[in-house]
């Protein structure tokens, strides 16, 4: 009887892992090219401030990088926006990827939720945008918290 319980637990665990992996970005558009290549552009600590001319310059640089690199994925790693209004800042900071219809993912830094929106509200905003791959996985702490699969 102990062996049956052990096998049952193993099977339930295996199927749970498979199911949870399938739930997270199961319709991901991330694929290696036929040549086996996948290009990622990373922007970090953009500190976008809505209405600040320096932020407009940062937007120009992001456009230049995206035009030059033509990435398969863009990742923003923390402190994308610095200062309220957060929604306006996020929409302007993400404009380069949104207008190109590129898939993107965001992780939050220590300043992102200091702009008048909580991390949960920011994630809800991101989830409403086309191309966003940011999400949170049930049962894991942190917002957002996820893994992306490249096939």
Positions of the model-derived regions?
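Positively charged n-region of N-terminal signal peptides that target proteins for export
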Residues: 1-5
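Bacterial N-terminal signal peptides
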Residues: 8-16
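Hydrophobic alpha-helical membrane context
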Residues: 15-16, 57, 91, 124
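Short, intrinsically disordered/low-complexity patches at protein termini
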Residues: 16, 65, 74, 106-107
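N-terminal active-site segment of His-dependent metallophosphoesterases
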Residues: 21-96
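Extended active-site neighborhood of metal-dependent phosphoesterases/phosphodiesterases
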Residues: 24, 91-151
């Amino acid at each position: 009887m102990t062996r049956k319980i052990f096998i049952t637990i193993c099977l339930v665990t295996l199927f749970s892992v498979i199911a949870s992996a399938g739930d997270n970005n199961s319709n991901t558009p991330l694929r290696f090219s036929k040549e086996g290549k996948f290009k990622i552009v990373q922007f970090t600590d953009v500190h976008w401030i809505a209405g600040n001319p320096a932020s407009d310059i940062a937007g120009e640089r992001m456009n230049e990088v995206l035009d030059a690199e033509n990435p398969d994925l863009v990742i923003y790693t923390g402190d994308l926006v610095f200062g309220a209004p957060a929604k306006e800042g996020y929409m302007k900071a993400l404009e380069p990827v949104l207008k190109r219809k590129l898939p993107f993912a965001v992780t939050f830094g220590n300043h992102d939720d200091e702009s008048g929106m909580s991390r949960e509200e920011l994630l809800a905003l991101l989830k409403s945008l086309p191309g966003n791959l940011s999400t949170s996985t049930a049962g894991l702490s942190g917002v957002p918290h996820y893994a992306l699969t490249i096939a």
